[in-house]
Curated annotation (Swiss-Prot):
PANTHER family (alphabetical): MRNA TURNOVER PROTEIN 4 HOMOLOG, MRNA TURNOVER PROTEIN 4 MRTO4
One annotated GO molecular function: RNA binding
Renumbered residue ranges of the record's region Disordered: 215-239
GO CC terms in record: cytoplasm; nucleolus; preribosome, large subunit precursor
UniProt superkingdom: Eukaryota
Job of this protein: Component of the ribosome assembly machinery. Nuclear paralog of the ribosomal protein P0, it binds pre-60S subunits at an early stage of assembly in the nucleolus, and is replaced by P0 in cytoplasmic pre-60S subunits and mature 80S ribosomes.
Protein name: mRNA turnover protein 4 homolog
Record field: compositional bias (Acidic residues): 229-239
Modified residue annotations for Phosphoserine: S225, S229, S233
Keywords assigned by UniProt, alphabetized: Cytoplasm, Nucleus, Phosphoprotein, Ribosome biogenesis
Gene name of the record: MRTO4
Length: 239
């Protein structure tokens, strides 16, 4: 009896080796950027959206951005004065915790700060986000929805029915109150009705100067990285 292709064994050693190679490549890339660019900025991200971070990468093609893999970035830069790649880079590693990233650039502090201060994009809130404002729906026809959507709206909790083939809201309905922690159902309803509440924002927090080795704070402080147990994003590291 021929063996099924599904029975093919995968060598864990090969998988581990590939993962190690990827980490080593990232370490080399980071150190190359340290040697190439004048400035290194640490940024934090609110309401992370991969598509919007990609837009920023495209706008900053003259520079390099890394996001995620905090532990690997810490290894590349060094965690202490004794093993840091260049002077004061251990100060950068201390701040690599949570949804933060690195921007390597030759643009000045003023140029970077001005661009990112102005940049903001709205998107739909997700479950677990807080409602930015109260949303209430008035009764009446919901002509933006095809009749086939009515069962789904009802399942989400809306008091709807079909009247002459038109989806109709039968009574007032409060989707959420300002400050509510949104449920998956509330987030879905807000998206269906076009209410954007999540502000995607990148904030510059710190700067490291490669020529002087100076490390300085630019925004509100970030908590220092704890240890190996630091939770990190699985987002793509680089473009």
């Amino acid at each position: 009896m021929p063996k099924s292709k599904r029975d093919k064994k995968v060598s864990l050693t090969k998988t581990a080796k590939k993962g190690l190679e990827l980490k080593q490549n990232l370490i080399e890339e980071l150190r190359k950027c340290v040697d190439t660019y004048k400035y290194l900025f640490i940024f934090s991200v609110a309401n992370m959206r991969n598509s919007k971070l990609k837009d920023i990468r495209n706008a900053w093609k003259h520079s390099r951005m890394f996001f995620g893999k905090n532990k690997v970035m810490m290894v590349a830069l060094g965690r202490s004065p004794s093993d840091e790649y260049k002077d004061n880079l251990h100060q950068v590693s201390k701040r690599l915790r949570g949804e933060v990233g690195l921007l390597f650039t030759n643009r000045t502090k003023e140029e970077v700060n001005e661009w990112f201060t102005k940049y903001t994009e709205m998107d739909y809130a997700r479950a677990g986000n807080k409602a930015a404002f109260t949303v209430s729906l008035d009764p009446g026809p919901l002509e933006q929805f095809p009749h086939s959507m009515e069962p789904q709206l009802r399942q989400l909790g809306l008091p709807t029915a079909l009247k002459r083939g038109v989806v109709t809201l039968l009574s007032d309905y409060e989707v959420c109150k300002e400050g509510d922690v949104l449920t998956p159902e509330q987030a879905r309803v807000l998206k269906l009705f076009g209410y954007e509440m999540a502000e995607f924002k990148v904030t510059i927090k710190y700067m490291w100067d490669s020529q002087s080795g100076r490390f300085q704070q630019m925004g509100d402080d970030l908590p220092e990285s704890a240890s190996e147990s630091t939770e990190e994003s699985d987002s793509e590291d680089d473009d």
